[in-house]
Swiss-Prot record:
The gene coding this protein: rplO
Protein's name according to its UniProt entry: Large ribosomal subunit protein uL15
Role played: Binds to the 23S rRNA.
One biological process term in Gene Ontology: translation
The keyword Ribosomal protein belongs to this UniProt entry's keyword annotation: yes
Subunit structure: Part of the 50S ribosomal subunit.
Organism: Bacillus velezensis (strain DSM 23117 / BGSC 10A6 / LMG 26770 / FZB42)
InterPro entries: Ribosomal_uL15, Ribosomal_uL15/eL18, Ribosomal_uL15/eL18_sf, Ribosomal_uL15_bac-type, Ribosomal_uL15_CS
Organismal lineage: Bacteria, Bacillati, Bacillota, Bacilli, Bacillales
């Protein structure tokens, strides 16, 4: 293969279709917009969700639920992520933040039981799932709620 034989891969370079540039182009005259009407006008067209005056789907369906103003958004950490710490470490929310395991403290930290913990650690968090507490204690560590 020589330099002058190189070709771009199939479909990687698509020519932009210029509309309204003479009828010989196949996209001239009305430029694919048809004749007259709202969609042929400049700035024409209907808003998203408009169904021609028929009651739109989003209005036909009932409203549902509410936003709980007392919701607490916990930073989630699975126990397999704790294997990155040295044996006997005291894992606190501040340490998790420093090491980049979590990006924000939010309302606190909740430890979940996905994965396997192989190290004996003292884990301090705001909440533990039942399986996470089991996993920490099975590895010989302690799970403390703060």
């Amino acid at each position: 293969m020589k330099l002058h034989e190189l070709k771009p891969s199939e479909g990687s370079r698509k020519v932009r279709n210029r509309v309204g540039r003479g009828i010989g182009s196949g996209n001239g005259k009305t430029a694919g917009k048809g004749h007259k009407g709202q969609n042929a006008r400049s700035g024409g067209g209907v808003r998203p969700g408009f169904e021609g005056g028929q009651m739109p789907l989003f209005q036909r369906l009932p409203k549902r639920g509410f936003t709980n103003i007392n919701r607490k958004d916990y930073a989630i950490v699975n126990v397999d992520k704790l294997n990155g710490f040295a044996e006997g470490t005291e894992v606190t929310p501040e340490l998790l933040l420093e090491t980049g395991v979590i990006s924000k403290l939010n309302a606190g930290v909740k430890i979940l039981g996905n994965g396997k913990l192989e190290k004996k650690l003292t884990v301090k968090a705001n909440k533990f799932s039942a399986s996470a507490k089991e996993a920490v204690e099975a590895a010989g560590g302690t799970a403390e709620v703060i």
